[in-house]
Amino acid sequence: RDTGEIFFQNERVFNKSEKLVPGTKGIAIVHQDFQLEPGYTVYDNIRHHLIQFQKSYQESKTEEIITLCHLESIRNQTSKELSGGQKQKVALAKAIIEEPPLLLLDEPFSNLDNISKAEFKTILKNIVKKLTISLLFVTHDSIDALTFSDEILIIQNGELLKKGTPSDLIQKPPSKYAAQLLG
């Protein structure tokens, strides 16, 4: 089945023939491939998204986001010099530079070692708190879903099975599939 619509801030943003994010005002995404400008430094990759603003604002906002995403030590490196975890943090910084109300993350923890994962989760929590934005992330890792989410949507074969808090879903899984998925 491929039916239904998605609304964001009371406007329809998705149907079968449309894409959810590109061009949808107020929604930003961190892709798995990061989409960084190869010859740009970390600083320029982030600042590039503020080109329409005055230079003083570009600089102050870029500095704020660099600090928020813990990128100070690599600010002058180009994207080709960065590790995967560093690239992911730069992609995150690019996505939040205009403070979207909603941030989508595609498997944000899947390619990170435990130390990098813990740091990235801390950064995300700080972003949510400081910028008051919402996160929606896709994961196949039940531990990440259960330990990092306020609410979980369990989807099977493209259909929503259940929405609930991690503790509610663990205590009363809606199906055998959900119980297996959540461990």
Name each model feature, range by range.
Residues 12-28, 52, 169-173:
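ABC ATPase NBD coupling module
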Residues 16-18, 35, 40-59, 68:
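ABC-type ATPase nucleotide-binding domains, specifically the catalytic core motifs of the NBD
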Residues 97-101:
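A short, proline-enriched helix->beta-strand linker immediately N-terminal to the Walker B motif
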Residues 163-164, 172:
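ABC ATPase "signature
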